[in-house]
């Protein structure tokens, strides 16, 4: 599920997502869902887990936006996570989190503070840290929703989409293409 609202940031969108899911649960008459991973309580606490702190806790090593890709490759090898040797540190962090931490998140959890390459359309973090204002909602160990504070700076957007188009040209199936019409509309 992905949804956006004009002038709303990631926190407003998280509340909207929670409201939508809980309304659906009420409509079908259940507050809990039994799964092979455990009981999902849709009306319990909805936690927030930062990508870097969450990964750090799971692997027992402090991971920050400054962590070198070589360290992350060693962690991937130790945890038997398949990676592409061409991936940079941001991509490695995102993949490691998805493979190591995400499957352990049974109850609703907003995973937030991703590296910029994870969502090129998201606004830079208001703290000034090299992060973006975006989250994925994980329920039952799987991504069930996503949203972000939308990037409205055409200069930053062009830089990100240009970088993404280079990744796409190099064979990255998840990278975005350069969209000149979109960029002109922002300008």
Where are these regions (language model features)?
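Short, polar/flexible loop-turn hinges at active-site or ligand-entry regions and domain interfaces
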Residues: 7-11
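Metal-assisted phosphate- and nucleotidyl-transfer catalytic regions
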Residues: 23-142, 161-187
